[in-house]
Amino acid sequence: MPRDPLIGIVGKPSSGKSTTLNSLTDAGAAVGAFPFTTIEPNQATGYLQVECACSRFGKEDLCKPNYGWCSKGKRHIPIKLLDVAGLVPGAHSGRGLGNKFLDDLRHADALIHVVDVSGTTDAEGKNTRGYDPLNDIEWLQDEIRLWVEGNLKKRWGSIVRKHTATKSSIVDTLQAQFGGYGSHAPMIQKALDRLKGLPPLEKWDDEWITRVVKSFMMEKFPTVLALNKIDHPDADKNVSKIMLKYPDTKAVLTSAVTEVFLRKLKKQGFILYEEGTEFVDTFEDEPDKLKPLDDKILNRIENIRDLVLYRFGSTGVVQVLQAATDILGLIPVYTVKNIQTFTGGNGTNVFRDCFLVKRGTPVGKVARYIMGGEVTIASIETVGGVRVSEESLVEPGKNDILGFKIAPRSA
């Protein structure tokens, strides 16, 4: 059974990494047990917001997930987050908590790199003015590359000799070296396919080793940039520089401290706030539902509206987790016992169970993942009781609501 996806949160000190993590993990609602068997000390549970299947069928009032929650058709799905500590220049050589940083990193399926785009903290998180946050993006990539590359080069002579003696494929040889980072053969093949004119492994020089490692990093460590502190006056110019330098990298503009502030006021009953949107209502808008705020807080909310919400459409926190799961190709799949009513059995609650699955996964593989390998699947059905083959693929809005019929055990 595949393990749950794990999103690593990285960032230098004072970048807003801890605040971002807090904003992603704040439940904001009474939530039941987690679906995960273990949560390590440096792991947390975040909540991915998606359009729930209940909204397709007008069943929002009946949607009661077993894990997470659903509000007005917005489902919040639990997902594991990893707080990756120790990010400082020189981490690859063990500086700071470098060894722990790199050991944590290899467990992550994707990274959210929190970048302070205000330019008010230097490479080590100390207060300054006019710092270029492009440096932070570059040295994170350099630290990972130097770590992987250094481990490879230390053994390169023996790697080449064994590769030649055993007549192994490049994929098999690299998998033997990269397996400790959580790689698998298809991942390595995809990384190699990106490289044009790749010579035989025994002819690789330092430049080719670097190119291979960089391509491997794109597969193993896909990264979303959380460009944080967007309400600072210097943020605009720094965001523009980053977008120009990294046009193909997924980037989301965020203000994590704003998100945490708004959620706190919402919990205390001072505002109505819909996460992931620009909408904030106060006592002046809803006097029957909300408590009044003092002028100082009201002025801060007005500034938040002007500098963040109306300008960017949201604080970006909901969107950054969506972007991380998107680069992994993960989509929600709903499993039900009754494909006609979408319930879990005899009750009236719908779409109780939801799993994150890679887009394009065969339906039969999903069935074995959910039901376990010890049962025999007699048939698989989707909306309307339509039978689907095990080879049919899961796609957004297609084969993403499934019911499994189990074959009776033979005597």
Curated annotation (Swiss-Prot):
The keyword Phosphoprotein is annotated on this UniProt entry: no
Entry-linked SUPFAM superfamilies: P-loop containing nucleoside triphosphate hydrolases
CDD domains named in the record: TGS_Obg, Ygr210
Keywords for this protein: GTP-binding, Nucleotide-binding
GO cellular component annotations of the record: cytoplasm
Molecular function as annotated in GO: ATP hydrolysis activity; GTP binding
Record: residues binding GTP: 11-18, 83-87
Segments forming domain OBG-type G: 5-274
Entries under InterPro entries matching the protein: Beta-grasp_dom_sf, G_OBG, GTP-bd, P-loop_NTPase, YGR210-like_G4
Miscellaneous comment text of the record: Present with 11600 molecules/cell in log phase SD medium.
Protein's recorded name: Uncharacterized GTP-binding protein YGR210C
Organism: Saccharomyces cerevisiae (strain ATCC 204508 / S288c) (Baker's yeast)
